[in-house]
Amino acid sequence: MAKLDHTIIIHAPLEKVFKFMADPHNLPEIWPAMLEVRNVTANPNGGSDFEWTYNMAGMHFDGASETAEYIPNKRYITRSKKGIDSRFCWEYENIAEGMRLHLEVEYKVPIPLIGKLAEVVIIKQNDHEANNMLHNLKDRMEIQVPITA
């Protein structure tokens, strides 16, 4: 399994960031590779289950994710039920400057026949994609938030 690990500081209320990220409909807005989110349903344990179409290395993959753990304003974990085998763990923490978001992803590159070199390139692209997504979230959340010294 490939692993990604990113942390970002967002100068916005934690509750605002969590609420935005808890709605899968918002993912394509900040995550260019997430082409579509559909059939979103409430999970009985909190959070949402949803289907998606994702672009990895120019190939489109359809899948579905379900909530594995949902602790409001603290942690949200999803795992795939079909499609790309993955687990996303989002951890939220209040800090003096706003909030810290930690993203940890484990996933299986879905193309076993491409060879090790191509797999390394795809993993680097996905790492870059995750970083861009977090910065897009930061930009989106910091809009209309007063900056205080």
Roles of regions detected by a PLM:
Residues H6-I8, G63-E69, R87-N94, V105:
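Hydrophobic/aromatic beta-strand elements that line small-molecule binding cavities or substrate pockets
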Residues L14-E15, A42-N45, E69-N73, E91-R100:
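A short, structured loop/turn motif at beta-sheet edges
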Residues F50-N55, R75-K82:
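Short beta-strand segments that buttress and anchor functional surface loops
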Residues A12, M56-G58, E69, I84, ...:
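Beta-strand elements of well-folded, non-transmembrane domains
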Residues K16-M21, L27, F50, T67, ...:
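Hydrophobic pocket/interface hotspot
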Residues S80-N132, T148:
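Beta-strand/loop substructures that line and gate deep hydrophobic ligand-binding cavities in soluble
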Residues M1-N45, N136-D139, I147-A149:
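Hydrophobic ligand-binding cavity/cleft-lining segments
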